């Protein structure tokens, strides 16, 4: 019984870690795309681009913090 409980808990933990890695890779890929977009549009509307990218980054950071809190069992 103890082995089954350990295996179940360990499998759940591995699933959470996999989900966390996947979401972090999505966030990192979106941040890299935002940085590339900022470099391409450096001349035109730089203030608006900065504000938009900053807002996206803040939202991504908030999502990452929320997901980390859920995956780590805190709310």
Swiss-Prot record:
Pfam families: Hormone_2. GO terms for molecular function: hormone activity; neuropeptide hormone activity; type 1 vasoactive intestinal polypeptide receptor binding. The modification Isoleucine amide is found at residue 27. Its main location: secreted. GO terms for cellular component: extracellular region. Keywords: Amidation, Cleavage on pair of basic residues, Hormone, Secreted. The modification Asparagine amide is found at residue 72. It is found in: Secreted. It comes from the Eukaryota. GO terms for biological process: adenylate cyclase-activating G protein-coupled receptor signaling pathway; mRNA stabilization; positive regulation of protein catabolic process; prolactin secretion; regulation of protein localization. PROSITE patterns: GLUCAGON. Belongs to the glucagon family. X's at positions 28 to 44 were included by homology with the human precursor sequence. This is VIP peptides. It comes from Sus scrofa.
């Amino acid at each position: 019984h103890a082995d089954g409980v350990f295996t179940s808990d360990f499998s759940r933990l591995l699933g959470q870690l996999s989900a966390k890695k996947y979401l972090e890779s999505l966030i990192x890929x979106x941040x890299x795309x935002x940085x590339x977009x900022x470099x391409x549009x450096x001349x035109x509307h730089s203030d608006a681009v900065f504000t938009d990218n900053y807002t996206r980054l803040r939202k991504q950071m908030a999502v990452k913090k929320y997901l980390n809190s859920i995956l780590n069992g805190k709310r």
